[in-house]
């Protein structure tokens, strides 16, 4: 028996939020699609069906570990394209799986393959246990008997020659490959599905999926707290850069880079949470290449380092301490810029300001200080 796995990820759905197709969004430190591919590692050859515009992304993410196939205008066309790519091979069994189901247990896949020894098709499903209603105009119009009803899952498995012929003969518009198979007269066995095998569709599904992954690893949540502090003195100039935003002022800030005191404090907070020292360790002020450098370079490095270590940024809080300039009118733009660099939602970033009540060097308007706090959450 030679197995091929077809992972269908050609959709453009953004119901899960953030404007990015869900298969490319991060899940526990890796894109959803990478997690899905990993679930079938070692089983056989893997074909990943992508939207034509995403072929470059697929190559960057998966390289030569899989065969990339350009999808069609419908799911059925996408699957057929992958099946056609297998014609002439030695494949005898094919598993067709949703790219947005990254948590399929190996036991489910094994059950599907075992069933194919006695039937031309097999698919996992869970019996419907909730009460079912029929609705009309927002009102309950009746109830539906749930006896014999199932929630379909994937991978849906078939003997290769039969499902290829079925797709070639199907007129199109099928909800899934079981419908295509049944249209061709093929019997499809139901094998037990699994609650972990959820299809990521909406934003809350990501939190549920990450919880399942943590439970599988036997890990409690790894939460780290980092603090950062920075100070820069005023010098001659007509503006300051705070949290990536140019703010008009009667003075500038003195520093080896662009002296963005808020971004420096936040960057140090991330490094601190990772036990990675401070900016000076990674970007020494003695190195002339960083003279006048934009501070987003430092923050971007820290955020990517956190991600590479398996952490996501839970939230960031930056406090700027100065008498002038006024930060309030620019705070929203500052938070948005920090969020953009760290690739997190703006709602997870806070920028605010306070004074030292005319005390100390900030009270004497000799410079600006900043304190930042960040939480890192392990995947």
Curated annotation (Swiss-Prot):
GO terms for molecular function: 2-C-methyl-D-erythritol 2,4-cyclodiphosphate synthase activity; 2-C-methyl-D-erythritol 4-phosphate cytidylyltransferase activity; metal ion binding. InterPro entries: IspD, IspD/F, IspD/TarI, ISPD_synthase_CS, MECDP_synthase, MECDP_synthase_CS, MECDP_synthase_sf, Nucleotide-diphossugar_trans. Keywords: Isoprene biosynthesis, Lyase, Metal-binding, Multifunctional enzyme, Nucleotidyltransferase, Transferase. It comes from the Bacteria. Its EC number is 2.7.7.60, 4.6.1.12. The record marks 15, 22, 256, 355 as: Transition state stabilizer. Pathway: Isoprenoid biosynthesis; isopentenyl diphosphate biosynthesis via DXP pathway; isopentenyl diphosphate from 1-deoxy-D-xylulose 5-phosphate: step 2/6; Isoprenoid biosynthesis; isopentenyl diphosphate biosynthesis via DXP pathway; isopentenyl diphosphate from 1-deoxy-D-xylulose 5-phosphate: step 4/6. Residues 1-223 are annotated as: 2-C-methyl-D-erythritol 4-phosphate cytidylyltransferase. SUPFAM superfamilies: IpsF-like, Nucleotide-diphospho-sugar transferases. CDD domains: CDP-ME_synthetase, MECDP_synthase. The record marks 146, 199 as: Positions MEP for the nucleophilic attack. Bifunctional enzyme that catalyzes the formation of 4-diphosphocytidyl-2-C-methyl-D-erythritol from CTP and 2-C-methyl-D-erythritol 4-phosphate (MEP) (IspD), and catalyzes the conversion of 4-diphosphocytidyl-2-C-methyl-D-erythritol 2-phosphate (CDP-ME2P) to 2-C-methyl-D-erythritol 2,4-cyclodiphosphate (ME-CPP) with a corresponding release of cytidine 5-monophosphate (CMP) (IspF). HAMAP family: IspD, IspDF, IspF. In the N-terminal section; belongs to the IspD/TarI cytidylyltransferase family. IspD subfamily. This is Bifunctional enzyme IspD/IspF. The gene is ispDF.
């Amino acid at each position: 028996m030679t197995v091929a796995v077809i992972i269908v990820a050609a959709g453009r759905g953004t119901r899960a939020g953030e404007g990015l197709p869900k298969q490319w969004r991060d899940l526990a430190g890796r894109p959803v699609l990478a997690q899905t591919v990993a679930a079938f590692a070692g089983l056989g050859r893997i074909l990943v069906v992508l939207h034509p515009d995403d072929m470059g992304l697929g190559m960057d993410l998966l390289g030569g570990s899989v065969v990339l196939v350009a999808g069609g205008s419908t799911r059925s066309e996408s699957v057929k394209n992958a099946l056609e790519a297998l014609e002439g091979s030695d494949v005898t069994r094919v598993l067709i799986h949703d790219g947005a189901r990254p948590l399929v247990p190996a036991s489910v896949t094994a059950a599907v393959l075992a069933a194919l020894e006695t039937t031309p098709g097999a698919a996992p499903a869970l019996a419907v246990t909730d009460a079912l209603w029929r609705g009309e105009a927002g009102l309950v119009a009746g109830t539906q008997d749930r006896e014999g009803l199932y929630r379909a899952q994937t991978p849906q498995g078939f003997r290769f020659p039969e499902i290829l012929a079925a797709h070639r003969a199907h007129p199109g518009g099928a909800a899934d490959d079981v419908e295509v198979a049944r249209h061709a007269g093929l019997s499809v066995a139901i094998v037990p599905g699994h609650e972990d095998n959820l299809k990521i569709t909406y934003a809350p599904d990501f939190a549920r999926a990450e919880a399942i992954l943590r439970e599988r690893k036997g890990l409690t949540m790894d939460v780290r707290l980092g603090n950062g502090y920075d100070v820069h003195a005023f010098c001659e100039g007509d503006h300051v850069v705070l949290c990536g935003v140019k703010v008009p002022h009667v003075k500038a800030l003195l520093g080896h880079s662009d002296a963005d005191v808020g971004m420096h404090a936040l960057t140090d907070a991330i490094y601190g949470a990772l036990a990675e020292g401070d900016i000076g360790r990674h970007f020494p002020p003695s190195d002339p290449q960083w003279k006048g450098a934009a501070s987003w370079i430092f923050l971007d490095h820290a955020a990517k380092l956190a991600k590479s270590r398996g952490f996501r940024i839970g939230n960031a809080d930056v406090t700027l301490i100065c008498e002038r300039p006024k930060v309030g009118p620019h705070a929203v733009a500052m938070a948005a810029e920090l969020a953009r660099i760290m690739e997190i939602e703006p709602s997870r970033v806070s920028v605010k300001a306070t004074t030292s009540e005319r005390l100390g060097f900030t009270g004497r308007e000799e410079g600006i200080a900043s304190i930042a706090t960040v939480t890192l959450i392990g995947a």
